[in-house]
Amino acid sequence: HARLAADETFTRRVAPTFRPDKYLEPAAGGWTGLLARLSEVSGCDATTLDGFTEAMENRRAYFKQLGAVSSDHSHRDLGTIILDHDRAASIFDASVAGWATVEEMTLLRRHLFTDQARMASEDGLTMTVHPAVYRNHDAAAFHRFGADIGSDVPVTLEVVDSL
């Protein structure tokens, strides 16, 4: 984005998009490593729920400062929930420690996703949601280009009750 913005021959506007998906997925491999990186770039301790929330707000502000107008979200479902802070913090801590159940991590993801909506209502980034996609299905493309490169395949999704 920065190179295109600095290129005087490129006359279109380029706006980055905030993509927090992988940081909201405690059940995904490598999540604690992502929290370490998030802590590093945000200057916040993202290994606690409060620190994670502060780090997310920090990164959203950073992207907005760079010209972002939206955040982009893609999860397996549209489930949303607002957990009591103590319950969410407890599940977050258990997820960091590696002993949260799959059910608890799903609740946490839904809570963190819902909190992104709160942040969007406060910072003005439009929340773009494209759920229910099967990613990385093409082994050759995955090995050549890496994870999450597009070519997603839609899967069945319940919408009304989730929201």
Where are these regions (language model features)?
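Histidine/acidic residue-rich metal-binding segments in metalloenzymes
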Residues: A2-R13, G33-L163
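Enzymes and membrane/adaptor proteins characterized by extended Gly/Ser/Thr/Asp/Glu-rich
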Residues: R19-S39
